[in-house]
C-alpha cells in the first residue's frame, strides 16, 4: 500500500486508570521488530487520576518514539482514539487497548496484511491472569471470532484494528457519543464506502479475561447501552430503538473442564443473567432516549 516496505505506523492506545495495563502494553510495543523510526506509539491518557500518566512519561523518557497524548475533555475510549488520530503522523493507524500484549513480530505481521486491505482485524486471544474463577472461565468462552465479525458484521474490535489514514480521511473518525459499539458503527461505514476488510490470523494480540462478576456486569451494561445508542443515531443501519438485544446463545465450557455437567449448568445460568444485564443497559438507555424525545 506504500512505496516503502515499512510504511509509517501510529499505534494508538487509549487508557484510563490502568498503570499496570499500560506498562505491559508499552513494554510489548517498544520491543516490536518493526523499525523504530517508522513507528510512533501514542498512549492517550483519558483523564486518569492515578499514576497511569507517570508510567507513560517514564516510557516517553526512555523511548523516543513514545509520546504521551492527553484527552481530558471527553471521557470515553472513542474520544481518546480520535484524539490519537488527530496527533498521529502515520500512514496506518493501529489500535490496541491498554491491557493487551503481543509477540515482537505482531506489528510487522499486521502491516503486511495491509497490502491486501485498507482495514484489517487482528487475531485476539483471551488469556487468564492466574485467577481460575467462574467469571474468568465464562469470559474465556466468548473468545473473539474476528473472522466471523468481519465476514458477517463488517467490523473488527478496536482493541485489534489497523486502518489506513486514507480510509479515516474518507469516512471520518469514531463516533464519540457511543459508549460501546463504535467499532461496529465505524466498520459499517468503511464497508459501505467500498473498502476491503480483512482478517490477519497470524497477527495475534493477547487480551486478559474479565475475572469477576462485577467486571462482566459492567461490560454487559455498557454493551446494552451502545446497542440502543447505535439505533438512536443510525436507525437506517441498525434499526429503530425499542427492539431488545437478542440472546447470543448459552455458552458451554470446553470439553477439558472438570465437573463438566455442573459447569455447563452454571454457564447456562450466567449466560441468561448476562443477557438480562445487557437488556437492562439497553432499556436504561432507551428510557433516556424516550424522555429526550418527549420533552
Curated annotation (Swiss-Prot):
Q: Which EC number(s) are documented for this chain?
A: 2.4.1.-
| UniProt subcellular location | Cell membrane
Q: What Gene3D superfamilies does the record point to?
A: Spore Coat Polysaccharide Biosynthesis Protein SpsA, Chain A (3.90.550.10)
Task: Fetch the InterPro entries from UniProt.
Answer: Glyco_trans_2-like, Glycosyltransf_2, Nucleotide-diphossugar_trans
| Domain of life, source organism | Archaea
Keyword annotations for this protein, in alphabetical order, are:
Cell membrane, Glycosyltransferase, Membrane, Transferase, Transmembrane, Transmembrane helix
Q: What pathway does the UniProt record associate with this protein? A: Cell surface structure biogenesis; S-layer biogenesis
Q: Does the keyword Glycosyltransferase apply?
A: yes
Membrane-spanning regions, if any? 265-283
Annotated membrane topology: Single-pass membrane protein
UniProt GO BP: S-layer organization
Q: What class of enzyme is it?
A: transferase
* Record GO terms (molecular function): glycosyltransferase activity
One Gene Ontology cellular component annotation? plasma membrane
**Keyword Cytoplasm part of the UniProt annotation:** no
**Knockout: what is the outcome?**
Mutants contain only mono- and disaccharide-modified phosphodolichols and exhibit defective or limited motility.
Q: Which family does it belong to?
A: Belongs to the glycosyltransferase 2 family.
Q: Explain the purpose of this protein.
A: Involved in the assembly of a N-linked pentasaccharide that decorates the S-layer glycoprotein and flagellins. Catalyzes the addition to the dolichol phosphate carrier of the hexuronic acid found at position 3 of the pentasaccharide.
**What protein is this chain from?**
Glycosyltransferase AglI
The organism encoding this protein is: Haloferax volcanii (strain ATCC 29605 / DSM 3757 / JCM 8879 / NBRC 14742 / NCIMB 2012 / VKM B-1768 / DS2)
